[in-house]
């Protein structure tokens, strides 16, 4: 009898015992009258020694990535022949039987070479890509993380509940994926962009602690690293303040990182307001792994002779500056020009600079700084070989553009420590933002967030000034999650709908079922959604979320693996009472 084991179960206790392993051929080497086979399964590797004449005939047919069954006796290898690069390198299996379970076609790329395949090939043959150790470990980590999340929240009395996948189309910003109904001709379901409304209804139902590992869908234009379907940890709690969410998520992240990467995060994360983040880092999701803080130099230029700055200040603009210490020699004119072009992408009018050389300003706008030279040197402890960059613009543009310059400089100067994880909370976000194109207000996050108490009575008079009970969790300069305390009365929810352009009749048609629920004793409640794909990407230092999704789409929301999306038959269209115009196009 042979004992069936996995590769990682090989140990001293099994020496001289007969074992069976089912696995894939990672490597095969023929050496005259012996053949060595390296097997790989999900758990580890093992080496097989084949010397039997009949078995050698079988091994002559075996190629890499064949799936085979090996039966044999486990032996210790001579000490000098032990493979120290393998956990099981001190052992080998002396083969007695070998069966080919299934053969493998010529490989589209080498499994052991991570760099020899383009992205499209890796997506088309994702099942082969996942045999690579690095890719496999990322998916295994994903499973561990979701398991930890479930255990942690269940112990905190949360209920794991499933909200509907077919829902009413209630636009939340991006386009909905629509599903035609065969039974209800001419009617459509939408796939949820998030479980937002349904988790709030769960609170109205009195189920005060909810969570879900939720699949979400957004029909967005192709850009960057977006996926049309993604996964988030969605949770909601009743009778809470934002501090309750902060504590819950800090402890959860601590548990995840400690039990997977053996990294002890701080028990409490940094916190800063949206305004402070924008002023200091030029971003509402700042990367705090490096300093490089933005300075507001407006007060120093109030009496400056530099008309560009003077005009901007008189028009209620601001002067933002970035001081790079002891690095002026690294900024050639061409590099500075590239930085200026980068700033202009983010709508800045220009990027100005001055260097400190021989205790004097030089280059750029140096001649306009003489009258405030000593003030700047003392205020910012300037020294030789420092360089200052300036942006004069509206507050929002100056902050955002300088924030992008900050990121580019930090990347080029290699200032970012990629081996640390810096979490922080951003809170007190604006509730609304004004769209210059449509001349109307939009929800900055979403329409269900509660305004801070002091703004509730003046919502309509100045929406731009209204701050909300909204918070984001940021990790290494990336928004990991977003949440808020929610509106829990119909009257206030209707007012917010009106501000963003949903008059009563439109709001009733789209959200009537939700507004009705708010009339039946809704509790104070709030929650957060954490992007699991994004979390895993950061934990594994991956360059793309595709690496941590089992079967991802490409950048065009298509699957090279199953060739979706695909056309459907005329019969299917007739059943749905649909016709397609210009099908050939």
Curated annotation (Swiss-Prot):
Alphabetical keyword list: Aminoacyl-tRNA synthetase, ATP-binding, Cytoplasm, Ligase, Nucleotide-binding, Protein biosynthesis
Domain of life: Bacteria
Positions bound to L-aspartate: 172, 218, 445, 486
GO biological process: aspartyl-tRNA aminoacylation
Similarity-based family: Belongs to the class-II aminoacyl-tRNA synthetase family. Type 1 subfamily.
Job of this protein: Aspartyl-tRNA synthetase with relaxed tRNA specificity since it is able to aspartylate not only its cognate tRNA(Asp) but also tRNA(Asn). Reaction proceeds in two steps: L-aspartate is first activated by ATP to form Asp-AMP and then transferred to the acceptor end of tRNA(Asp/Asn).
Protein name: Aspartate--tRNA(Asp/Asn) ligase
Gene this protein is translated from: aspS
